[in-house]
Design a protein with these regions (language model features):
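Helix-helix packing/entry segments at the starts of transmembrane helices
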Residues: 41-43, 86, 90, 102-111, ...
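Hydrophobic alpha-helical transmembrane segments of multi-pass integral membrane proteins
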Residues: 9-13, 39-58, 80, 135-141, ...
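Hydrophobic/small/kink-forming positions within alpha-helical transmembrane segments
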Residues: 22, 26, 82-87, 91, ...
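Membrane-interface helix termini and inter-helical loops of multi-pass transporters
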Residues: 26-34, 65-66, 98, 147-160, ...
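Glycine-/small-residue-enriched transmembrane alpha-helix faces in small-molecule transporters
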Residues: 1-42, 156-183, 203-207, 311-316
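Hydrophobic/aromatic residues within transmembrane alpha-helices
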Residues: 31, 40, 44, 96, ...
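Hydrophobic transmembrane alpha-helices of multi-pass small-molecule transport proteins
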Residues: 52, 119, 128-150, 205, ...
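Specific transmembrane alpha-helical segments of multi-pass solute transporters/efflux pumps
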Residues: 20, 24-25, 53-109, 145, ...
Length: 316
């Protein structure tokens, strides 16, 4: 009964995470109209860190064993996570969309759960079960039905090849961040992984902004209140609260189990557009939403309970 309750908690947390992540779509659109990519992500990560650091300090007070000497190995791990896990899905994604399209990015992002599952097998030795393959297919089909407008507007012509390739690399970076974070969570707390990877990401964004952008990150005058509100939403909700919950669930279940939940993101993006701008919803989109939820529930509820049952049986 306890395991079943835990599985439902994981499922509810993943639903909430994707709902908070969906808020980044309108927020990035508003902020991106005024701020360049590296500057935007620098301030987003900084605001998220302002939220996380007090929680981490409180954690250190409660758990004395969390504090440890910062060795070269630790620095190297967070440098790797920040450069290859934070910069690609933030700066590179924005750069790729500018040279491709948002519709192409939405379609190419469907590869992230598949990439996560594959990296989980290669990097962490996770098993590729039939349930995981079935859930991935279920979520993929559901997301394609939800994203019918993106499919109709997508274009993969040769002129957009570079942008599409960079978007794909951004998706790989996102998958790497989640998978490598799972490995680091065996040695560090959720807040440590987030804060130190964000610090590396901020440093990289600051360097990119100062070197290549027309208005460096430290020139903050001239941005509207709407821009700063959007950045605040991104920092506190999408990269703050949502990522804490995501890391908490990632520490409880395998990468392969959590991957399909990312297919909920387009569903909540659609729901938010219906609520805010009164977009019309179609029957295929309703069916797609149901399939996406079913795919996530299958992994977080059914496989988690099945794994726990097998573990319990093996211990007798």
């Amino acid at each position: 009964m306890t395991m079943q309750k835990g599985a439902w908690i994981n499922f509810a947390a993943l639903v909430l995470v994707n709902l908070l992540w969906a808020a980044q779509y309108p927020a990035y659109k508003i902020a991106g109209n005024n701020m360049e990519s590296a500057t935007l992500n620098f301030w987003t990560l900084l605001l998220a860190s302002f939220l996380l650091v007090p929680l981490w300090l409180r954690e250190k007070q409660k758990r004395k064993n969390v504090g440890r000497a910062f060795e070269w190995k630790t620095f190297r791990e967070y440098l790797l996570l920040g450069l290859f896990g934070i910069v690609p899905p933030s700066v590179m994604l924005s750069w790729g969309i500018a040279r491709s399209s948002a519709s192409n990015a939405a379609i190419l992002s469907l590869t992230i759960p598949v990439l996560m599952t594959g990296l989980g097998v290669l990097m962490l030795g996770e098993k590729l079960s039939l349930i995981r393959v079935f859930s991935l297919l279920l979520g993929l089909v559901g997301t394609l039905l939800v994203s019918t407008s993106d499919l109709s507007q997508a274009s993969f012509s040769r002129s957009l090849l570079l942008g599409n390739f960079v978007i794909l690399l951004a998706g790989l970076g996102s998958a790497f961040y989640n998978t490598y974070s799972k490995d680091l969570l065996s040695r560090y707390s959720e807040l440590e992984v987030l804060i130190f990877s964000y610090a590396v990401g901020m440093a990289a964004c600051a360097i990119i902004s100062a070197a290549f952008e027309t208005k460096p990150f430290y020139l903050i005058a001239g941005y509207s209140s709407a821009t700063w509100f959007a950045v605040t939403v991104l920092g506190l909700l999408s990269w703050g609260v949502a990522m804490v919950l995501w890391m908490w669930v990632l520490n409880r279940i395998e990468v392969g189990q959590i991957s399909t939940s990312i297919y909920l993101l387009p569903l909540f993006g659609l729901i938010l557009s219906i609520v805010t701008v009164h977009d019309r919803i179609t029957l295929p989109q309703i069916l797609g939403g149901a399939l996406t939820v079913a795919g996530t529930a299958t992994l977080t509820l059914f496989e988690g309970r099945r794994s726990a049952h097998m573990t319990g049986s093996g211990s007798h």
